[in-house]
């Protein structure tokens, strides 16, 4: 049984295969070509955290592939009334062909996958966000070619998105420069996944210099609202500005997994500027996940 809980659940060759297939599926969709290999298949979607892009991309993706997506929330299921995750996994996975879970604790994903008869996909956890990384890697490849031996600058919180970038650097062989204030950096065991490809910087400009891609995320994620003021103070100097993009160079792309807070982690002029590919990046969630659904349900 194959699951997709982290990028490391796929080999390097499989990641490249998924990226190629994602671009093929995007091109087919834009050309109006009907491709429905998942007729009769059902994706169960468990949302403990609300979402726009994750829900729309998985629901639309299943519909475009000929299947159906079933939305489940703790409020509407026995999960919200204390049923053990293991029991829910045993039951739901016998009725659907795959399960996507967007949750807070990564351990919930692991417990569910450990008792599931169907593939489980990490739609986001507090540890990592591998589906977003597939879309980001697809977007970079489409605009700049292979990411191997390139340089990526992560500016801001060493959060789940940063963790997945660290995994990707170790797997795919590109340099990752992380600029984050003390207290908000990835733990040593996470950094170790990137090996000598990852460096941590105190200064955002030093991290961004010569980067092929500059990327960031919100300073306070869902569930961290009470920390907003403290985080705004800690992350002063870690905003992606026009001057920081100039430091990176005209070749640098800008990405953000969204939603973005203009004027906090990124200036509006950067988000809307010529180096920004965030809207392609957002669309590619749809196509990268369609490739993943094919891979897990059909084996290709």
UniProtKB/Swiss-Prot annotation:
Which residues are listed as membrane-spanning?
none
| This protein's pathway | Amino-acid biosynthesis; L-arginine biosynthesis; L-arginine from L-ornithine and carbamoyl phosphate: step 1/3
What InterPro entries does UniProt report for this protein, alphabetically? Asp/Orn_carbamoyltranf_P-bd, Asp/Orn_carbamoylTrfase, Asp/Orn_carbamoylTrfase_sf, Asp_carbamoyltransf_Asp/Orn-bd, Orn/put_carbamltrans, OTCase_ArgI
One GO MF term = ornithine carbamoyltransferase activity
Q: Which UniProt keywords apply?
A: Amino-acid biosynthesis, Arginine biosynthesis, Cytoplasm, Transferase
Name the GO terms of the biological process aspect: arginine biosynthetic process via ornithine; citrulline biosynthetic process; L-arginine biosynthetic process
Q: What Pfam families does the entry give?
A: OTCace (PF00185), OTCace_N (PF02729)
Residue positions annotated to bind carbamoyl phosphate are 51-54, 78, 102, 129-132, 257-258, 285
Tell me where in or outside the cell this protein is found. Cytoplasm
Q: Which family does it belong to?
A: Belongs to the aspartate/ornithine carbamoyltransferase superfamily. OTCase family.
Check the record and name the NCBIfam families matching this protein: orni_carb_tr, PRK00779.1
The name of this protein is Ornithine carbamoyltransferase
């Amino acid at each position: 049984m194959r699951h997709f809980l982290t990028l490391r659940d796929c080999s390097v060759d499989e990641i490249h295969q998924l990226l190629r297939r994602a671009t093929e599926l995007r091109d087919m969709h834009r050309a109006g070509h009907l491709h429905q290999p998942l007729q009769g298949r059902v994706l169960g979607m468990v949302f403990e955290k609300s979402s726009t892009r994750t829900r729309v991309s998985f629901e639309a993706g299943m519909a475009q592939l000929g299947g159906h997506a079933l939305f489940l929330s703790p409020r509407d299921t026995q999960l919200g009334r204390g049923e053990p995750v293991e029991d829910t996994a045993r039951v739901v996975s016998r009725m659907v062909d795959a399960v996507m879970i967007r949750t807070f604790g990564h351990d919930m994903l692991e417990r569910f996958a450990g008792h599931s008869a169907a593939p489980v996909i990490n739609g986001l956890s507090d540890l990592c966000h591998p589906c977003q990384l597939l879309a980001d890697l697809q977007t970079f490849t489409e605009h700049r070619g292979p990411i191997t031996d390139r340089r990526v600058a992560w500016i801001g919180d060493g959060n789940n998105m940063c963790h997945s970038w660290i995994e990707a650097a170790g797997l795919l062989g590109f340099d990752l420069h992380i600029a984050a204030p003390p207290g908000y950096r990835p733990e040593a065991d996470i950094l170790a996944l990137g090996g000598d490809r990852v460096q941590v910087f105190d200064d955002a400009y030093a991290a961004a210099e010569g980067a092929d891609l500059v990327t960031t995320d919100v300073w306070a994620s869902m569930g961290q609202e009470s920390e907003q003021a403290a985080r705004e103070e800690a992350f002063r100097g870690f905003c992606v500005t026009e001057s920081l993009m100039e430091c990176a160079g005209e070749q640098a792309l800008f990405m953000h997994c969204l939603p973005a807070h203009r004027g906090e982690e990124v200036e509006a002029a950067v988000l809307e500027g010529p180096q920004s590919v965030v809207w392609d990046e957002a669309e590619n969630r749809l196509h990268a996940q369609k490739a993943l659904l094919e891979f897990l349900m059909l084996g290709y």
